[in-house]
Every structure is written in structure tokens, then in C-alpha cells.
Amino acid sequence: MSNTPLPSSFDAHPEFFQETKWQKFTRRIKEEPLIPIGYAATSYALWRAYKSMKAGDSIELNRMFRARIYGHAFTLFAIVAGGIYYGQERRQRKEFEKALQQKQDQEKRDAWLKELEIRDKEDKDWRQRHAAIEMAAKEAEKKRG
């Protein structure tokens, strides 16, 4: 059986989505708050370096370039340390998300099959009505002719 998802009119249904991008973003910031701090420190150092360059203060400019490097190092350390610290939790979360995705795929497949059954029933009903109308027309034709 193919792993491609089955098409359905339920694709845009909101109950099939668990976590929005914004929710994921805020969750990741709460899990690893040092990374945004490192980003902020690096950005601040770059901003101060820009201001120093505009003012012509080469000593402050060099100091801010060093601060930018320290900010990058801090951010890199936070990423590596967070990866080590949250590694097991991330593996468990990926397993959970995989199981959740399988459940959602099964729900979508079931909904799609139900939708196909409904459409099939409607088609059969239409064919029966159409056959009955044809029979009535033939009987009326026989009575006339």
C-alpha cells in the first residue's frame, strides 16, 4: 500500500492539526531559553559595532566585534548543551509525534472511506431513481402506443 495520504475534503479540518508554528516556536523558546538570549546578545553586539563604526570609535568597534564572537560562542554552546540535555526528550517527542501522525492518518483514511461510501450510496440511489424514471417512461410509452 502506498504511503501517500489519501485525498479528502477533510484535509483542511482543524482537528487534524496539533501544534501550530507559533505554539512550536514558543515551546522551543521555553525549552531552551539560552539560545534566544545568545541571539539577542549577538544582535546587540552587532548593533553596537554599527553605532561605533558610524561614530568612528575603532576601540569600541573592535570590542563589539569580540562581543559578537562571544555571543556566537554562547549561542553555539547553548545549542549543543540543549541538544545533549533534551536529546532523550526529543526522541520521545518524535516517537509521540510519529504515533500521533499515524493516528491522524488513520482517522483521515477512515473519514475518506466513509465519504466514499456516502458518495457510492448517493450514486446508487441516483441510479435507482433514474432506472425507476426510465421504467415509468417505458410503461407510459407502452400504454400510449
UniProtKB/Swiss-Prot annotation:
Main location: mitochondrion
UniProt keyword Transmembrane helix, yes or no: yes
GO cellular component, one term: mitochondrial membrane
Coiled coil: 86-144
Pfam families per record: HIG_1_N
Membrane topology: Multi-pass membrane protein
InterPro entries named in the record: Hypoxia_induced_domain, RCF1
UniProt keyword terms in alphabetical order: Coiled coil, Membrane, Mitochondrion, Transmembrane, Transmembrane helix
Disulfide bonds: none
Domain of life: Eukaryota
An individual GO BP term: mitochondrial respirasome assembly
Boundaries of every HIG1 domain copy: 6-97
Compartmental location: Mitochondrion membrane
Residue spans crossing the bilayer: 33-50, 69-86
Assembly mode: Associates with the respiratory chain complex III/complex IV supercomplex.
PANTHER family: HIG1 DOMAIN FAMILY MEMBER 1A, HYPOXIA-INDUCBILE GENE 1 HIG1 -RELATED
Role summary: Cytochrome c oxidase subunit which plays a role in assembly of respiratory supercomplexes.
Family: Belongs to the RCF1 family.
Full protein name: Respiratory supercomplex factor 1, mitochondrial
Organism (species): Ajellomyces capsulatus (strain G186AR / H82 / ATCC MYA-2454 / RMSCC 2432)
Phylogenetic lineage: Eukaryota, Fungi, Dikarya, Ascomycota, Pezizomycotina
